[in-house]
């Protein structure tokens, strides 16, 4: 028994010390009877805190990009980034884009450069500064061999760190100073919920231009109202009323817009969501037919789940009798192993297979234990374990044809 405990502890220490990094994604594309391969890889120099991301396309017309990212001594903050493109004629890497970032207390400054004749030329500069109660963001452009102010956004925060006032400025070249162009003022209720936003524009004087109101009506419905200031008064342009039907587990939102001829708000859209145990089961969208004075269904979506609350089917049907359906399969661990795409035949009313994706996982490794420094995996698959392979098929009416295959390679240290 003691030996088993010692072995378990020893194995646990090794497992904790082991680091798993995603190193590359190799994709094979099958088209016109030929295979084309692409490789997206990343390598990190721990000593120099430098990350290199390489993308290579092999085939009749080779193509490639390279990105080199330099971090600070702790390996956390990005200091610089350089991008290069592969020149098939010369076999060299040509400069494409560069950014240099510096940090000063609460300030972050990023200078960007574009390549002209393989030489770096200033492009844009971004300067952001945060304090306890404000945020400032300034944009510069590069002209006449120097950085020139272009625009500025200043945000004043309230005690809850929410927007209180937002001001936007443009740089006046002649006066060499910032010119305030517009501003927005936010108002909250005692519970800290947004109640009103008023936008102001500058003419001879500052005048209110647009107002967004959020409130609860006497029936308990949530209301969003959009108003414009015209001819000395506020005119409601559109309004959305959201009702929660707790008895039938429904959320109903009705949108109305101003009829410029009658000067009255008229129905335009109705959106109904139905829930079961807090899980969305159905969405139906209706539009208002002005001539028939009635709602017509534009779109309906139905969703189904398994006992683990995984979405296993999403079906959408449109007003032209077309439809699309996704079916998801999961393994016992909760990994999505297959996605099937089907289209609805408006004539036969039958679903026909069209595309399919299959995933393969390493069930011994958890997904959240994998380090992907450059985020080269953008698949966003629903999974618990580490992804090893992805296959993409299309259906030709008789059989499934493999069109793409991706392999995910890792480095275990």
Describe the role of every protein-language-model region.
Residues 1-21:
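Bacterial Sec-dependent N-terminal signal peptides
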């Amino acid at each position: 028994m003691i030996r088993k405990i010692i072995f378990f502890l020893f194995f646990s220490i090794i497992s904790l010390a082991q680091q798993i990094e995603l190193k590359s994604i190799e994709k094979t594309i099958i088209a016109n009877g030929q295979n084309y391969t692409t490789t997206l890889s990343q390598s990190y120099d721990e000593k120099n805190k430098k990350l290199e991301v390489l993308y290579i396309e092999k085939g009749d017309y080779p193509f490639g990009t390279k990105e080199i990212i330099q971090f600070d001594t702790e390996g956390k903050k990005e200091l610089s980034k350089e991008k290069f493109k592969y020149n098939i004629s010369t076999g060299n890497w040509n400069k494409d884009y560069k950014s240099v970032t510096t940090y000063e207390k609460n300030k972050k400054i990023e200078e960007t450069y574009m390549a002209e004749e393989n030489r770096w030329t200033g492009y844009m500069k971004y300067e952001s500064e945060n304090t306890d109660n404000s945020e400032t963001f300034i944009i510069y452009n590069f002209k006449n061999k120097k950085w020139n102010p272009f625009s500025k956004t200043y945000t004043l925060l309230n005690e809850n760190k929410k927007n209180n006032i937002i001001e936007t400025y443009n740089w006046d070249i002649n006066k060499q100073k910032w010119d305030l162009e517009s501003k927005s003022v936010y108002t909250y209720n005692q519970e800290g919920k947004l109640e009103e936003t008023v936008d102001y524009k500058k003419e001879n004087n500052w005048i209110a231009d647009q107002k967004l109101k959020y409130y609860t009506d006497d029936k308990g419905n949530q209301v969003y109202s959009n108003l414009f200031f015209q001819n000395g008064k506020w005119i409601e342009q559109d309004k959305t009323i959201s009702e929660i039907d707790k008895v039938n587990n429904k959320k109903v939102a009705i949108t109305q817009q101003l009829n410029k001829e009658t000067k009255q708000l008229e129905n335009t859209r109705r959106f109904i969501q139905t829930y079961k145990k807090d899980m969305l089961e159905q969405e139906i969208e209706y539009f208002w037919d002005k001539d028939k004075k009635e709602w017509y269904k534009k779109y309906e979506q139905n969703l189904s789940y398994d006992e683990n609350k995984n979405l296993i089917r999403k079906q959408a049907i449109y007003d032209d009798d077309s439809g699309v359906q996704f079916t998801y399969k999961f393994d016992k661990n909760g990994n999505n192993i297959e996605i099937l795409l089907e289209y609805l035949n408006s004539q036969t009313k039958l679903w026909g297979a069209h595309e399919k994706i299959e995933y393969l996982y390493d069930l011994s490794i958890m997904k959240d234990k994998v380090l992907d420094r450059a985020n080269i995996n953008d698949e966003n698959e629903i999974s618990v374990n580490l992804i090893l392979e992805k296959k993409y098929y299309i259906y030709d009416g008789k059989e499934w044809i493999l069109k793409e295959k991706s392999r995910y390679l890792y480095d275990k240290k």
